[in-house]
Amino acid sequence: KDSIDKSTKGIQEEIFSMRLIPARFLFSQLRRIIRDISKELGKDVYFEVIGEDTHLDKEILDKLSAPLKHMLKNSLDHGIETPEERKKAGKNAKGFLKLELYQKGEDIVIEVFDDGRGLDSKKILRKAIDFGIAFPNKKYTEKEIFNFIFIPGFSTSGFVTEISGRGVGMDVVKNNINELNGTIEIESV
């Protein structure tokens, strides 16, 4: 019986390891998206990825694909400025976008960072008030304000483009992450 249990456990571990694939398969898709969208937007961006050799369950990697694509598109469209805007702000004309994936204990941590303009909390709050999800006289923390972007239909964009402005996206990102029993946090410096 003991050897059967060990054999069964060995088979289970083998099957599980066959489901694990390196994140590089997803990252190569993301590189193409970054290249195409930055070209379309007239933005020059250096895209750094860390953690390509981290192995994840294929199903989890598939479920992370859409949220990561959306977050990176948002960074390009809303965060990273055009080369001209960056020069005026005293920055390098080439923007910087980083995606890092690593394991921390049992958790998988994914960080998306860009050196763009950051989130405009005043603009988000104004839009939230206009959208009817915030009160004009109430004081909100920055975290509370940033969480408005996860409300379905919410957008700070003044117009619709192929990339953004439809109010569809960050709520889906949050839902996808929640389905994986994950959390999402936004910081703006």
Where are the regions that the model predicts?
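Charged, alpha-helical coiled-coil and linker scaffolds that mediate dimerization/oligomerization
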Residues: K1-L125
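Residue-level detector of anion-binding/catalytic polar loops
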Residues: D44-Y46, A134, T183
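Glycine-rich/acidic phosphate-handling loop/turn and adjacent ATP-lid/helix
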Residues: F113-G165
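Conserved glycine-/histidine-rich ATP-lid loop and adjacent helix of the Bergerat-fold HATPase_c
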Residues: T156-S157, G167-N181, V189
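Contiguous mid-protein beta-loop-alpha structural module that forms a pocket-lining wall or clamp
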Residues: I186
